[in-house]
Amino acid sequence: MAYEKLAVQDKAVLEGILAEKKRQQANIELIASENFVSEAVMEAQGSVLTNKYAEGYPGKRYYGGCEHVDVVEDIARDRVKEIFGAEYANVQPHSGAQANMAVYHTILEPGDTVLGMNLSHGGHLTHGSPVNFSGILYNFVEYGVTKDTQVIDYEDVRQKALEHKPKLIVAGASAYPREIDFSKFREIADEVGAYFMVDMAHIAGLVAVGEHQSPVPYADFVTSTTHKTLRGPRGGLILASKEWEQKLNKSVFPGIQGGPLMHVIAAKAVAFGEVLQPEFKDYAKQIKLNAKALAEVLIAEGVEIVSGGTDNHLLLLNVKSLGLTGKVAEHALDEVGITTNKNTIPYDTESPFVTSGIRIGTPAVTSRGFKEEDMKEVGAIIAAVLKNPEDEAVKADAKDRVKALTDKHPLYA
């Protein structure tokens, strides 16, 4: 992408952009919530649509001159409904957090009881964390994973639902490496008369092409981000049945947002168009193959993986078993060009600023073209560094091996 105007007008900002571009090219990106969008998506997001205010919805705007952005928003809505087989879609949420907020705003009153997954067990801030609006406004009761299997205990979810009678049950996670059984959650919700919402932000790209059970047939509401495994711009969306259209639309605008970001919605439309292409199914399948290949090597190297493996795009490593903290492990890997994030693990005794684990995912490296053999090499590098975080010879060798992989799979070549 050329930056002729920026090079003349604002070299300081351009330097930051180019430095980040260089970092993305030189590093192996394993943050599970990140991905690399196509250049077409970036072009749409950097278009003249950034100039247009468009409060309201297609055909019902509060501003004139919206006839063209109406077309773009309709394309985005139609495509995402086709992808997931949904009756209704709202593509205006600026983020997944705001998509969740809009659903809560639609069906809950402050103080209502909600059942959500514990953040340290793999949930999300917006699923009831006490430092988040969700935990402040609503009475969240937490469920989690068992100590022995480290997977969701559906009977425990059921017992908590029977005891607390929540108005809403939330499923979905930000650091859970196993497939979630949405049909079981639906049964529990029906048993206690609760609404059921799924936040599929992390797995949406897998769901889109049948690589994970779809929540759409089971949930009253489905929310997602549009980046991560969907490989679109940063943003959010909501899916539901047609009956909720008016209430959900009002909750998004004017309920929690003003004007939509039309340039981002255009980028969402482009990304959704890419998801509808046959190549995307191959991509999603490769994400899982890469995650499994990475897990196999790490397990063979003696690195403990939460739940013993993965069914999706991410792995959660318990680095405490190697005598490290997540903070130390993240820094050690970053030094050799592998980007991860420290992450709490179930029943963690460390603070969220230190943690006992790191989270790694394969969406971004898969977008670069990494295959199973590449991931085996990545796994070997990770294991070597985590076992010898202070060994300069090991780190020098790791840097060379990382460079060989990033040179083999250039970004935006």
UniProtKB/Swiss-Prot annotation:
Subcellular location: Cytoplasm
Chief location of this protein within or outside the cell: cytoplasm
Annotated catalysed reactions: (6R)-5,10-methylene-5,6,7,8-tetrahydrofolate + glycine + H2O = (6S)-5,6,7,8-tetrahydrofolate + L-serine
Group of enzyme by EC: transferase
Listed cofactors: pyridoxal 5'-phosphate
Entry annotated with the keyword Membrane: no
Residues noted as binding (6S)-5,6,7,8-tetrahydrofolate in the record, renumbered to the chain: L119, G123, H124, L125, S351, P352, F353
Pathway annotation: One-carbon metabolism; tetrahydrofolate interconversion; Amino-acid biosynthesis; glycine biosynthesis; glycine from L-serine: step 1/1
Record Pfam families: SHMT
GO cellular component annotations of the record: cytosol
Example of a GO biological process term: glycine biosynthetic process from serine
Keywords of the record: Amino-acid biosynthesis, Cytoplasm, One-carbon metabolism, Pyridoxal phosphate, Transferase
GO molecular function, one term: pyridoxal phosphate binding
Record carries keyword Amino-acid biosynthesis: yes
Known role: Catalyzes the reversible interconversion of serine and glycine with tetrahydrofolate (THF) serving as the one-carbon carrier. This reaction serves as the major source of one-carbon groups required for the biosynthesis of purines, thymidylate, methionine, and other important biomolecules. Also exhibits THF-independent aldolase activity toward beta-hydroxyamino acids, producing glycine and aldehydes, via a retro-aldol mechanism.
HAMAP family xrefs: SHMT
Record note on quaternary structure: Homodimer.
NCBIfam families: PRK00011.1
UniProt-recorded name of the protein: Serine hydroxymethyltransferase
Gene (UniProt): glyA
